Design a protein with these regions (language model features):
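N-terminal charged segments
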Residues: 1-83
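Acyl-donor-binding surface of acyltransferase catalytic domains
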Residues: 70-125
């Protein structure tokens, strides 16, 4: 299945919020204000997959980086979904821990993980 990515627009907030609400672990890097606000610098794009309740996110500057999707993470078909949309050599950046745990269970040894300790969430009081 070919995903149709398009640039993030301010009008996308309406459908974006639906995916945000059903995401198991929300990270600030994936919030609409961050993605939309930095879209000019990082070329953020989204592709909706309504039948799977997933919103795929991609960064296009300085090169293409596939990011974790928002939406329904609790599913048992991740291996099939990723292979059909991204192929056998898929590479994802900034995958939240809860999604990574699901992928570890379902993808097993084919998954290579690189911990990026320089990237972390800010905590505010």
């Amino acid at each position: 299945m070919l995903l149709e990515f398009r640039d993030i627009q301010i009008e996308d907030i309406s459908f974006f919020e639906n995916y945000w609400k059903i995401t198991s672990q929300r990270a600030s890097d994936y919030s609409f204000p961050i993605l939309w606000g930095w879209a000019g610098d990082y070329g953020y794009q989204t592709a909706r997959e309504d039948d799977k309740d997933l919103l795929w996110i991609r960064q296009t500057v300085p090169r293409n980086y596939d990011l974790a999707p928002l939406g329904k993470w609790k599913r048992d078909d991740w291996a099939e979904i990723i292979q059909k949309r991204f192929g056998k050599e898929a590479e994802f950046w900034l995958v939240p821990e809860k999604l990574l745990d699901l992928w570890k269970l379902q993808l097993g040894d084919i998954l290579e993980i690189e911990d990026m300790r320089g990237r972390w969430e800010y905590l505010y009081d």
